[in-house]
Amino acid sequence: VDLFRKARSRRSGMSTTKPSKLKEIIPIFTGPWAGKPPGFGQVDTVVHCGASLEGNMAFTVNWTDVATLWGKRRIQWNKGQLATRASLSVIKEKLPFPMRGAHPDTGSEFINWHIKDWCEANQVELTRSRPYHKDDNAYVEQKNGHIVRRFLGYTRIDCQAALPAMNDLYEVLDQYLNHFVPSRKCLEKVRIGSRYRKQYDKAQTPYQRVLTHLSIPEDVKANLRREYGQLNPLLLKRQVDMLIARAFKIQHDCGNPRSS
């Protein structure tokens, strides 16, 4: 028993601060977001569990840049710390601009030493929202429903072999959404009596927001213009539909039908 406890508590090369203290070390950030430059994103996981949380299943890591609403998604097997770190690494490499900040909720897939050390090594500022305050992560929470649930629904994804096809889907879907689908950003939320009144900006695509943002270098914008010039929204949408069908066929053929 003593040997087991020692093995569990050994954290070679890391701080001796207890893991329970991480929530005290990682600062809470509630805004304002308006002054944050591109690269500061909100991040969350979406579970693909169907009607049951039992057993193994897929999770989508959803990252939304607050300044431009540029989004990237990555599906992974379960929501372990190492799997989540790997997903963040892929997302970071695929962003058109440097990742500067990651702002999750208080979930254990993000609030752990693997993620904290990864953020420090990559010069990514790690902050967190308050427990039970979804509004602290409103930008990514909105995308959870508008994108992940809209395109993948609530079906249980418990076939690991389907994940590569799901990530192929996300690659094309992200291109389609970032370049061609406009959305509005909430600028102000004012309480009037028992209701809230929200003020939104003009609807723009994330691509348009990147091109007009003064802090993004011209070489980044030039690369995106070249990419945009090679894309056809109709063909991308057809690809998205085809990849959804392919991914769910794999899931249907090898998944657990009783847990869908």
Which sequence ranges carry the predicted segments?
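Amphipathic alpha-helical packing elements
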Residues: 43-48, 127-148, 196-254
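Mobile-element integrase/transposase regions
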Residues: 1-62, 70
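Generic recognition of stable, solvent-exposed alpha-helical segments in well-folded globular domains
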Residues: 41, 83-86, 110-114, 142-143, ...
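RNase H-like two-metal-ion nuclease catalytic core shared by retroviral integrases
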Residues: 104-119, 126-152, 163-167, 193-195, ...
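Charge-biased, low-complexity intrinsically disordered regions
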Residues: 36, 55, 170-173, 227
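Mobile genetic element proteins and their domesticated derivatives, centered on retroelements
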Residues: 44, 63, 69, 88, ...
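Active-site beta-loop-alpha junctions of metal-dependent nucleic acid enzymes
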Residues: 64, 73-96
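Charged, gly/pro-enriched flexible loop segments at helix/strand junctions
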Residues: 171-206
